Amino acid sequence: MKKVEAIIKPFKLDEVKEALQEAGIQGLSVIEVKGFGRQKGHTELYRGAEYVVDFLPKVKIEMVLPDEMVDIAIEAIVGAARTEKIGDGKIFVSSIEQAIRIRTGETGEDAV
């Protein structure tokens, strides 16, 4: 099992969710996050003073998948989230040792 984490632009969330559903992937967590990378921040004017906004709003999607679904998920995310502009985001894949469904006690891939 693998955990796939994708950090994307917030306005791309619906497209990414639909692409994942069309690929047969269900069950994900969505977290509002802030961050910066090469995109950096921008300046804003507030009550006559200029402020540097370092952290930009992003959305983090997390899902745990069987190994054979990881490439499918990555293709769906990249296809739906790409704008070809700086700040499109990143995808991280890591190994998961164990998963347990609390309600039933199922473990492993049966739990996801």
UniProtKB/Swiss-Prot annotation:
Lineage top rank: taxon: Bacteria
SMART domains: P-II
Keyword Transmembrane helix: no
GO molecular function, one term: ATP binding
Entry-linked InterPro entries: N-reg_PII (IPR002187), N-reg_PII-like_a/b (IPR011322), N-reg_PII/ATP_PRibTrfase_C (IPR015867), N-reg_PII_CS (IPR017918), N-reg_PII_urydylation_site (IPR002332)
Gene Ontology annotations of biological process type: nitrogen fixation; regulation of nitrogen utilization
Swiss-Prot/TrEMBL keywords: Nitrogen fixation, Nucleotide-binding, Phosphoprotein, Transcription, Transcription regulation
PROSITE patterns assigned to the protein according to its UniProt record, in alphabetical order: PII_GLNB_CTER, PII_GLNB_DOM, PII_GLNB_UMP
Keyword Transcription listed: yes
Pfam family, one: P-II
GO cellular component: cytosol
Record-listed O-UMP-tyrosine modification sites: 51
SUPFAM superfamilies per the UniProt record, alphabetical: GlnB-like
Signal peptide as annotated in the record: none
Family classification: Belongs to the P(II) protein family.
Functional note: P-II indirectly controls the transcription of the glutamine synthetase gene (glnA). P-II prevents NR-II-catalyzed conversion of NR-I to NR-I-phosphate, the transcriptional activator of glnA. When P-II is uridylylated to P-II-UMP, these events are reversed. When the ratio of Gln to 2-ketoglutarate decreases, P-II is uridylylated to P-II-UMP, which causes the deadenylation of glutamine synthetase, so activating the enzyme.
Complex formation: Homotrimer.
Protein name per the record: Nitrogen regulatory protein P-II
Species of the source: Rhodobacter capsulatus
